[in-house]
Structures are given as C-alpha cells and as structure tokens.
C-alpha cells in the first residue's frame, strides 16, 4: 500500500517493491544485498530521494519510457508530509488555502501503478547512504535497498545566520507549504503591523506578493541590496521600470539596503531592522528570500563529491562521483553551478530518464541549460531570454564561431575592444513597456533580450535564439511588429519550439497529444503533457495550439452548451425564440443531440433560464420545476444546513416601518437569523423547507413580494438618498432606483445582475461597480454598464451621458435584452462586455445608434416581459398543490436537524463545516443482510412528463433518496459525502449517450452515478462515493427498497452520526478571541455593559 501519511507512531512501516525485495527495519545494511543480484529476471529498483517537482517529472518520464520493457521498480522517499506540489505556484496558496489545488498529480495517481511497481514514503527523511551496500537509511530507521539511487533533495532557503537576531520570533523564509502556514498564522496574530520581505529577486517578489495577499499586514516593504529588482535577469532600465510598477501597486521598495542587525524585544520578538548605513525600520515580521542552498548533506560521509559552493557534483550524464548514484534538480552542481529555477531540473529529469531506459541508444547529454524566464510578478509581465546580458558581460557564444579570449575581453585588459553585440531598445513610458533585444554586430543573429510589460513574443524570440539560424527580417521589425496588438499566436512556431519551460514541453508535444486522439480537451492536454501545470504562463499559447490543431484536423473547437446541446447559449436562445419552443422536451427534440435525453446539470438550468427570459412561466409548474437548480426549485437560497434564506423585495432600499415590523415578527416567530445585505434589504436565514410556505404567506399578507435573491435575475437597485434628503443631492436617486427595480424585477438573465443609482458624483451607491449604474447630473443621469464586484472586480464603463429620466428606460431595455440574447452561460455583464467585438464602442453602436436595426424589437420584448410579471411567492402560497414540494420527508411529517445549531451574538446559525468530508467507502460497504421493505406510496412520484421525480424518505434515523427516471426507480443515501449535506434528492439528474444516469449534488456539483456497475461512484471526485440500494414499484401501489436492518443502516448512514456538530471544525476566531478577550467599551453598546437608557419607553413597539 502507498503511504499517504508516513509511518504511524509505534509501527514499522514498509513499502514493498516487486519480486519480494524488502524494505527492512533494524537490519545491518551489509547483510542486505544477499542474493538480490542472482536473479537475472528481476526488475531493478530505483530509489528517488525527494518528492518535489523535478522528482515527479523524472518519475513520470521514466514510467512513460519504461512502459513496454518494465525494467524498473520505483521507491520515492519524500521529506514533507504532502505529496508533490507545485512550488512555482506557491503564492496562490494564500488565495485558496487548499494544498490539493497545488498537487502536481492527484492522490489517486500514486496508487495507480500496476504490479506494485511504485511505492512512496511521506514525512520521511533519508539520513544515510551506504554506497558499498547500495542501501539508504531513513529517519524511521528503515533500510532501503537500491540498484540506482537518484538524489533529488532540492534546496533550502538561505537564512543569514551571521546576522544578529536571525533566530527571533517573526523571522520566516519562503520555500514550503509549512513556511507559508507559519507565516499565515503569525500574520493573523499581528494584524495592521508592518511586514518586510528581504530580497529583490524572483523569490523575493513572490514572497512580497504573498505577504501583500495576506491582507493582514498594515504595510509590506521590500528590501533589496541592489540598485534595482531582478538584477540577475534585468538591466538597470528594465529593473527600474519594474520597481516603478511595483511601487504603483502600493508596495514600498527600498534599494541598496543591507541588514546589519534585527532588533528584538525582551521576548525575542522582531521589532525592527538596523541597516548597514545606520538607518532603521520598524517591523514585526521579516521574510528572507535571499537565495537557496543545495541540500547536499548526504554527500559528506558517503564519498559523494560536493562542490565548494554546494551541490552534488555531476557530469553531463547526471552521474555523481559514486557509481549508480545520480543527482538532479537544485541539489546538483554542474560545472560548479546550481540552478534555482525549474526548467534546468526538468531537463535533467528528461536526460536521465531517457538514458536509463534507452541503453542501446546514443545517450543524451546535459548541456548548458536555458535560463530564460517568463513570469508575472506582482501583476507585472517580465521576461528575459537567451544571452540577456551579452552586452554587459560579452557574448557567451556567437553563432558561426566560438568567441576568442580577446573577443570577450579576457586577453588584454588594457586593450579597448570593439563591441561584439548591438542592442535595439524600445521604451513606452505611457504603456509601461520596455524591450531590449541583443543582436550580433551585423544584425544577422538574435542573441537574447528582455521584456517588461509586453511579453507575448517571448516564445517566438527565444526559439530564434536557440535555433541559431540567420534572421529573415531586419532587427527593426522586431520592435515595429511588437507594437501591434493581438493575442499570443503559435501558427508560425516550429514544432521544436519549447512552449512550457517548466516541464520542457514543445509545440510538437501538444500537437501530437491532440492528433493522436489522446487529448480531446484542453484539460486532457494539461494532464497528458503537463503543459500549463507549472507557473501557468504558457496557457494562452497552449490554448492557441490546441485550437489550431483541432481546426486543422477538421474538429471544431466547441463552445457548445454541454454534451447534450450542440449550440452555444446565445445560439440556443435564438433557436428557442425563433421556433417558439416552450418546454424542455420541445428543446431537446428540436435542438438536442438526442431527442429523449434527460440533459444534465449544465443544460437544464440554462434552458430553464432561457424559457423564463422569453416566456416567464412559473418555475414550480410541473414541466419546469425539475429543470431548476435547488434555489429556483424552492424559490429560496439553500444554506449550509439545508435550510433556506428569505429575502423580501425592498425596492431601492426604501421600506416602511410597518413592513420592517412584519419582517421582525416573522423572524422572531420562526427563529431566523437576520442580516442587512449589501443590496439594502434584510435577509432572514435558517428557514426550514417545511416553513417556507407559512413564512411567505405572512410576508405576502403584509404587502411584500419575492426579492428573487435565489434567481439568476435582477437582484437589487441600490440607492443613496439623493435629493429626497441629502443636501448635496443633484437628482432623485431613490425615485429612479425604485422605478428601475420595479421594472426589471424577476426578469431572468444568463446570470444575476445588479443596479445602483447615485444622486451625485460622490457616488454613495457605488453605481460604477454594478451591471448597470446611474449617476445624477444637472442634466439627467450618466449611465454606466458592465461593472461588477466579485472574484474579478471591474469598473463599469460610460454608455451614455446626461440622459433625461424619461430616456433612461429605452437605453436600459435595449442593454439588458441584448445581454440576455447574446451572453454565454453563467456570464456576468462584465465578462460579456469584455468579450464583445469592439467592447463598449460596439455596445454603443447597438444600443444608442441602433447599428443592427433591432432597437425597437428589443424594447418591445422587454415590455412584454415587464407586462408578464407576477410575484412567484404570491402565486405559490395560493396553490395548495405545491405544498408537497416543501416537505422535508415524503413519507413522514417528522423533521430532523441536519446540522447542529449554535447561538452567537443573540442569534442562531449552523455550526461551521469541518475541513474533511465523509470519505468512507459507502459504495463498497458489505451489509449483513438485505430485505425488501415498503417505504413510500408510488403515487407520490410523477408518471411524467417530466421524466424525473424524486423524494427524500426517512427510515429509522437514516435519510434516503429515491429517483424515478423514465419510469425506473433508483435509490441512494441522501447525504452527499463532500460536506455531509443531506440534499441529493434535490439534485439535478443527468445522462450520457450510454444510458448512464447521475445525480448532481446541489451544493458543489459532485456527480454520483445511479446505474450500471459503477453505481455510487463520484464522477468528478474519486475520493468519495455513495451507497445505492435496489428499489422497485410493486402491484400493491408501494415502492419497496432492499435495505439492511434499521439499526445497522443507522450505524452506517444515520443522520445523528453524520450531521455536523459543534467542535468538529476549527473556530476561526479562537486565537483572536483569546488574545482580545475582555476588551469592552466603557460606554453603551455590548450586552452586559451599563450604558445610557431612554428616558421613556417608545409606544407601539413589538417585543424584540
């Protein structure tokens, strides 16, 4: 078995290799070899020390090249507790905090090898190597034999141990996940203070970005001993431009500073820095990113030669000074150089894997590596390629000749040499672009260069340097051509061009993976070739090559909605509109690939949205209800514990006291958590499904309507008070906001959209980050469109100026309808506007100038939608037939709590989700016995259409989901293991061409198969599965399930066992509350603090 967590305490852990070669604990290594070499048929064992990016690259390449001969078994020993992760993308960890997102391969990959040919240790260090016995010893005491040993131990971050205070609390390095987690924990406890990064190289800028992304420090400063950042890659002009761009982003950079001493307090906490020039800087945290030191400690006693500057000495075949021991990556010293970037390590892995698997062929040689880099650092595009310092240091090589000693200025220091290189430089101070290309004196050869701000020609130019071919165009065209726009294009690149330097992937590799049929999607290409899985900077080119290759093969690069619909969302909208298709079945018969397909979790909501945008049916009507996502299905947003939120509409944020009181009475009666939203209305959380009808009955009776907080439709139109109250107001923002919200409420779109109206340029309503926003002027309103907040914020753009109030509606009608007609699935207006050819100018032509001649038609369509408005909740509460949809269980009126509720700040909320889900093998569980048991009457389920209906039933303490799909029944557990949520019966059902059905969890779209040999398997997360049960309808009118005894069923799937309870998850504020406990104000405010009291009780109040 592969070891995922290393050895457990008190146990001897072994990892068996093929043919019985053991890993033995506590045995004299001299006795280990024994008769191992006497078996001529055995596979050789390669032991890899280290499990980093280079080690994994070597293993992947070796396995691929050895797939036919099967000559080798592999054991890899990793020192970190994690499987191999992407160290190049380390800074992204601060954004998602998920180590799994950095894994180079999923955990399943490590267990996918046949014949036990691959084993691995984690959290285990190799402490000794015994070359004479061909064994290594680990930190757990295990002795591991090898035939070939590959050292891929990497490097350590350098810490200035000679600097006083280097061991203080608050000193960090930037190298591993553990380093980042310690830094994150420290930063969280020192909010608002100053953090410092020391080092202005590649790693230093990454560390500075990481500290900035934490958002805990009040300020972050970058300390660099050089005159400009990236001094090893850039000249002074380029480095100074990068420094300026970084400063413009708010990061303070201090150049020509060397740390002399680190100041500390009596508890050895960092308090500041003393520089060698006598200046001082106050700070609480210092992250050193000043270089790396090769991990070569295994060299000393083993006889493996190490270089003076560190690293195992290797030759051009990657051999060390000891037979059958090789070194690759940052721990290897080639010609007294070590390399701290990934590309040379990948090249080493390529050379060694080829030579080990092709002994009969001419061996590959490791030559001077390409140290070119292309990165995005702190939002700045930076690239250097080829011999980028040839003008400063003299050329390392001149095409067609070898430079003499004189030519590189080494023969006679007193002789004034003629230059061997000419530089062509381009500067654009307005666009922040700098380019310097270095040519031979005759301009026939490109030697190298550097780029800032615009790096799209990097791959093409780097290949020109590598090819050493005479140029076909004059040097001037490199600059003139660079000024033209356009995306990265791979059409004119040779197949030998390296596209991905992180993993040494060429254009030909990508092309071949597609042409061979191995890769049919861009995700397949990334998985197969590893292109784009390092720093990710090559992805535009990889996408371009993939698209071009697919087109060359006659394959269309699809933007189809999904596998069931051969149209884009915009095309499908037009098909449905022109053919007047009014149901899902009509759409599938007219526009689907298979007329009787069930669709899937992608096309069903998209088609439902289009039907609503065109015809506005009630979502709970029989033919539409099954198409809806869970939110639309129950007209409310589902929350973490399976309850829902209730949001009445508050147009423009204006509400009467009576309606506020009604909301308060409802919230108190049903014990709902209340919160004011960013859209100026009140959200009530924690409503049980079975209470939604009663809650909305009371709200409707109080004169309120659905706020559509659950829908991909208009949410709110926010407003400031404008001229209604404000002394600075220029226009009536409240009046306009209410009119707009009342006009566009309930209208479905490809995604949610929001509006705002500000009464003057002070912009209190934040209209310029909304899908549409208005700002009052003396002449009317300026209309802005295409903005949003969210994960990728975007300021809106000005569509029209000084529009009179009566002319606002036609403009917005056209804008919204054009968006509904042409946007892609789940595309916000910001991304839609960016994708329009010509952007805002094109939109102006369509909306304002009627370029397409459809303005009147779009206004008419909007008016029809506005006239068709009805409140969905008002209609629902008046229809008693819909009550059955709002039961928790279909077979009983009982109710259960799915997540433990806690009280906080005088309100209730569900306890936090734990980090891990329920990863037990429910699918493979062996029940002691199964018997047929009646569970629910068959008439609960629809005979169709629609072709699908479902129910959640309760058996003992266990919740079970039953699905009726095209007349057949399927049954599973109700709990989705991912977050232990009891919701599967509310999930959308999908199918494929092979008749395979799946249910998609409403929360995070884990898809579980319902039928076939793999029933219960999760299609998109192999770490989890669900239990399935036989189920059938019988002549007595009941549905029967084949179930184990109730007690046994509850012991495996019971709600009480799996519902999330308080204490399972880490309290995010535990450290904060511990640190700041007891800090209370001296006046009124918090409960329990004596404060001012009203002089008299207000009348006509409710009991809050």
Swiss-Prot record:
Which cofactors, if any, are listed as required?
Answer: siroheme; [4Fe-4S] cluster; FAD; [2Fe-2S] cluster
Q: In which pathway does it act?
A: Nitrogen metabolism; nitrate reduction (assimilation)
Binding locations of siroheme = 764
What top-tier enzyme class does this entry carry? oxidoreductase
Domain of life the protein comes from: Eukaryota
The record's note on quaternary structure and interaction partners says: Homodimer.
Protein name in the entry? Nitrite reductase [NAD(P)H]
Q: Which organism is it from?
A: Emericella nidulans (strain FGSC A4 / ATCC 38163 / CBS 112.46 / NRRL 194 / M139) (Aspergillus nidulans)
């Amino acid at each position: 078995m592969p070891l995922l967590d290393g050895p457990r305490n008190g146990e001897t852990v072994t990892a068996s290799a093929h043919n019985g070669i053991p890993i033995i604990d506590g045995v004299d290594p001299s006795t280990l070899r024994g008769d191992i070499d006497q078996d001529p048929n055995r596979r050789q064992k390669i032991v890899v020390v280290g499990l980093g990016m280079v080690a994994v690259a070597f293993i992947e390449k070796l396995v691929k090249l050895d797939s036919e001969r099967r000559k080798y078994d592999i054991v890899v020993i990793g020192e970190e507790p994690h499987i191999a992760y992407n160290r190049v993308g380390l800074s992204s960890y601060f954004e998602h905090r998920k180590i799994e997102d950095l894994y180079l391969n999923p955990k399943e990959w490590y267990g996918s090898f046949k014949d036990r040919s691959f084993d691995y240790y984690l959290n285990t260090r190799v402490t000794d190597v015994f070359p004479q016995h061909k064994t290594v010893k680990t930190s757990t005491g295990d002795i591991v034999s090898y035939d070939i040993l590959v050292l891929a131990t990497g490097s350590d971050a350098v810490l200035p141990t000679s600097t006083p205070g280097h061991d203080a609390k608050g000193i960090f390095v930037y190298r591993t996940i553990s380093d980042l987690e310690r830094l994150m924990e420290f930063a969280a406890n020192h909010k608002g203070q100053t953090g410092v990064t020391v080092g202005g190289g590649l790693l230093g800028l990454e560390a500075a970005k990481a500290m900035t992304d934490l958002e805990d420090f009040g300020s972050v400063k970058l300390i660099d001993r050089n005159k400009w950042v990236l001094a090893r890659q850039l000249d002074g002009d380029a480095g100074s431009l990068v420094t300026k761009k970084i400063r413009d982003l708010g990061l303070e950079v201090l150049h020509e500073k060397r740390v002399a001493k680190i100041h500390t307090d009596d508890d050895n906490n960092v308090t500041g820095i003393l520089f060698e020039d006598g200046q001082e800087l106050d700070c609480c945290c210092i992250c050193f990113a000043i270089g790396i030191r090769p991990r070569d400690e295994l060299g000393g006693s083993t006889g493996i030669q190490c270089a003076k500057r560190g690293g195992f000495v290797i030759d051009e075949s990657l051999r060390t000074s000891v037979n059958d021991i090789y070194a690759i990556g940052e721990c290897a010293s080639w010609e007294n150089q070590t390399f701290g970037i990934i590309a040379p390590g990948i090249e080493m892995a390529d050379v060694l894997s080829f030579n080990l698997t092709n002994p009969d062929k001419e061996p590959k040689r490791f030559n001077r590596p390409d140290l070119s880099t292309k990165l995005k650092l702190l939002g700045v595009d930076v690239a250097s390629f080829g011999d980028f310092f040839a003008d400063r240091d003299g050329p390392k090589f001149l095409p067609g000749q070898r430079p003499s000693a004189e030519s590189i200025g080494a023969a006679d220091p007193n002789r004034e040499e003629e230059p061997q290189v000419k530089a062509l430089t381009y500067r654009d101070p307005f666009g922040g672009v700098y380019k310097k290309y270095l040519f031979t004196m005759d301009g026939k050869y490109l030697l190298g260069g550097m780029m800032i701000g615009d790096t799209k020609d990097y791959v093409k130019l780097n290949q020109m340097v590598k090819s050493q071919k005479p140029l076909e165009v004059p040097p001037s065209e490199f600059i003139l051509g660079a000024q033209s726009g356009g995306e990265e294009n791979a059409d004119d690149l040779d197949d030998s061009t390296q596209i991905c330097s992180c993993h040494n992937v060429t254009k030909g590799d990508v092309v071949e993976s597609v042409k061979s049929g191995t890769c049919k999607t861009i995700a397949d290409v990334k998985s197969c070739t590893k292109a784009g899985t390092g720093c990710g900077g090559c992805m535009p080119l990889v996408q371009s090559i993939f698209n071009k290759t697919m087109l060359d093969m006659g394959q269309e690069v699809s933007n189809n909605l999904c596998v069931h619909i051969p149209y884009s969302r915009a095309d499908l909208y037009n098909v449905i509109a022109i053919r007047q298709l009014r149901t899902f079945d009509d759409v599938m018969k007219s526009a689907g690939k298979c007329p009787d397909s069930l669709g899937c979790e992608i096309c069903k909501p998209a088609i439902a949205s289009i039907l609503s945008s065109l015809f506005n049916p009630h979502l709970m009507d029989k033919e539409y209800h099954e198409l809806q996502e869970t939110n639309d299905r129950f007209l409310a947003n589902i929350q973490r514990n399976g309850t829902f939120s209730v949001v009445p509409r508050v147009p423009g944020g204006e509400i009467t006291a009576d309606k506020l009181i009604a909301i308060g009475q409802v919230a108190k009666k049903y014990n709902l958590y209340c919160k004011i939203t960013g859209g100026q209305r009140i959200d009530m959380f924690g409503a049980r499904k079975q209470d939604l009808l009663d809650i909305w009955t009371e709200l409707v009776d109080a004169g309120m309507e659905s706020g559509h907080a659950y829908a991909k439709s208009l949410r709110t139109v926010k407003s400031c008070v404008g001229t209604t109250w404000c002394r600075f107001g220029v226009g009536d923002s409240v009046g306009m906001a209410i009119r707009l919200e009342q006009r566009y409420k309930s209208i479905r779109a490809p995604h949610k959209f929001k509006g705002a109206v500000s009464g003057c340029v002070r912009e209190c309503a934040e209209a310029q980050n909304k899908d549409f926003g208005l700002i009052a002027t003396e002449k009317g309103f300026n209309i802005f469109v295409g903005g949003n907040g969210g994960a990728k914020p975007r300021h809106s753009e000005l569509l029209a100026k000084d529009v009179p109030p009566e002319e606002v509606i036609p403009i917005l009608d056209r804008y919204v309808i054009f968006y509904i007609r042409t946007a892609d699935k789940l595309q916000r207006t910001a991304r839609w506007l960016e994708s329009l050819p010509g952007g805002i100018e094109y939109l102006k032509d369509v909306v304002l100038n009627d370029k397409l001649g459809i303005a009147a038609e779009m206004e008419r369509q909007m008016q029809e939608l506005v006239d068709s408005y009805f409140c969905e909740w008002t209609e629902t509460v008046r229809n008693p037939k819909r009550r059955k949809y709002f039961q928790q269980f279909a077979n009983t009126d009982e109710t259960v709590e799915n997540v433990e509720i806690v009280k906080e700040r005088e309100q209730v909320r569900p306890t936090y989700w734990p980090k891990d889900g329920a990863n037990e093998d429910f699918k493979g569980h062996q029940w002691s016995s199964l018997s047929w048991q009646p569970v629910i009457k068959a008439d609960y389920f629809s005979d169709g259409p629609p072709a699908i209906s479902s129910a959640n039933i309760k058996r003992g303490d266990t919740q079970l989901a039953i699905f009726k799909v095209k007349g057949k029944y399927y049954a599973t557990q109700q709990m989705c293991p991912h977050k232990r949520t009891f919701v599967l019966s509310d999930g959308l059902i999908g199918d494929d061409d092979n008749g395979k059905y799946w249910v998609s969890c409403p929360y995070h779209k884990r898809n579980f198969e319902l039928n076939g040999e793999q029933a219960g398997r999760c299609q998109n997360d192999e770490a989890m599965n669900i239990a399935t049960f036989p189920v059938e309808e019988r002549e007595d009118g009941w549905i029967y399930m084949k179930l184990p005894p109730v007690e046994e069923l509850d012991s495996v799937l019971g709600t009480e066992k799996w519902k999330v309870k308080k204490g399972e998850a880490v309290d995010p504020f535990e450290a904060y509350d511990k640190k700041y406990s007891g800090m209370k104000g001296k006046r009124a405010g918090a409960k329990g603090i004596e404060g001012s009291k009203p002089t008299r009780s207000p009348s006509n109040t409710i009991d809050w």
